[in-house]
Amino acid sequence: MRERLAWIALSVAAAAFPGRIGRASPMEDPSAGSAVFSGPTSPHPTSIFINPAALLFSRPGFHLHIGGALRLDQIGIDRKVVDPESGELADGPSVSTTTMSPTGGIAVWRSVLQERAVFGAMLHTPVIERFIADQDALRYHVLGGTMYQGMLSAAGGFKVADWFIFGLGVSLGYSGLHLEMARDTALEAGSGPERGIASDCGGSPCGIENPLASETITVDVASGGGAEGGFLSKLGGPFEDFTSNVGATLSVAIKVKGDWWGALSYVSPPGALPGRSLELKERGTVQIEEAPRDGGEFHRGRAQVRTRMPQSVWLGLRGPVLPGWDLVTSARWLNLSRHQQFELRMYGGDLEEIGVPEWYPRYRGMRDVVQLTGGLEGQDVGRTRFGGRLRLETGATSAVNVAPMQIEGWNAAATGGVDLQLHQHWVMNLGYDLTWFLPVGVDASAFDPLDRLACVDSSYDFDECRAAREGRAIPTAAGDYSRLRHTFMLSIRYDSL
């Protein structure tokens, strides 16, 4: 009876899951593989997504897991601005802010076939990125928003032999992007006196980043044609979108020697079905607030965003080194170089009449990330067990590509956690992760407003407009960046045996 109620609870949670929710690596749930007691060799519920083979390491019987995390990012930015006449950098405004990103999941799994197989399902949020909000000094890069993906994953692990386990998982995710930003209408009209930086803004030349020439853009898109409502309500979207949101996980676990196990898994991006482009397409609406010099009126139209999500490969090794303690190590490659931009298109309504560009890419410039993790964890015996890990990760953005929307340099982390048995069948987990990002000073930024002037003033010469095509010809992202992240994790688990 308990099992039936748990499966019903999972289904109800899926139907009620909100379409917009609340980042180790960018766009990533911190509890998926990086937290204590999780990873490619751990029987954590996130193994349903990252390594189903590891589910065979869990206790026999039925399991229900409900958990969440709260991530706080402390961010400091000392901006620099560009003089349009000399091209030199000068000190600009400073920003100190905190972003808060909640995430969560619910999972069930059960051993069957005399404990030779395990099947499970999980509703979770593997992709999370909350942007800096309400900072006018950063408005031409970001004014707020969230990138998210809610996912329903199902998987099985199969013990083919006592030394070999095979795992297979399938995931259906629906993604969304809510993005607020500004567009410098004077800069994007070039150097001329009619609409460009030499035109009038309150009795003086507009120049670059003049508030009177600032147009505000709010994009709200989602896969499934931008359907609103709960998670399951989006399943009515076009079949093209359905197949573009299906991913797969393949994994193996091999006994190396004695109680030492190694694991290898591959997690595909959305669109893993044969013949798919692996490109995520989201549709929805856009709202434009005209620049004050143009009247400040509101206009609405349609929006579409295309982007490419990363794939990942996990490698893990686990085994006893001290009585009651296991050494846990892992390495992960995240193929973020696929994620170069948000390809934004805005159309419909009267957007063309008021001069809103139909194609307006936003540059991201990510690169592949390698993560190395190692630590000690207590074995799953007794009423209490502790664990701790250290983590090192290469940066997803090089210094030139760092911007307020992507402060993703090299980082190091320490994480710890504890399992507390509250009752014969109930276990509570508490965890904390502290991640320090290497401070970055950016002088030669990939984002340069002078590239926009060169593009427009050349009558849109192909070579002169490369930065504009990539979404980099906007006010500079030069400056000094710092970031410190705190992640608090809490979960409760029911074990039938």
Task: Indicate residue ranges for each PLM-predicted region.
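Bacterial N-terminal signal peptides
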Residues: 7-16
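Outer-membrane beta-barrel porins/channels
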Residues: 21-38, 43, 103-497
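N-terminal, post-signal peptide beta-strand-biased segments of exported outer-membrane/organellar beta-barrel
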Residues: 17-125
